[in-house]
Amino acid sequence: MKLDRPAILVVDMLNDFVTGALACDRGKGIVPATAALLDAAREAGVPVIFCNDAHLPGIDREFELWGPHAIAGSEGAQVIPELKVGEKDYVVPKRR
């Protein structure tokens, strides 16, 4: 990936934040437009980067505030199916 060109950064569009443990109604509302943007970006060769919560039980203090969510490897920590991580996309886990 060249570092001198634009990219699309998608943050925390995960099952737990859109339909699960910490669902946000506004998150659901942006899904169609986000999916269309990602399709257009990929078609144009613009890199797509997903930056996602991937918490580790027993380590992450965020659970004290919000309860368990987006646990690494769980269904809740997966990108929502409507946005489909592509084979050329990048996925960056956020641990804390």
Regions found by a protein language model. Name each.
Residues 93-96:
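Short beta->alpha junction loops
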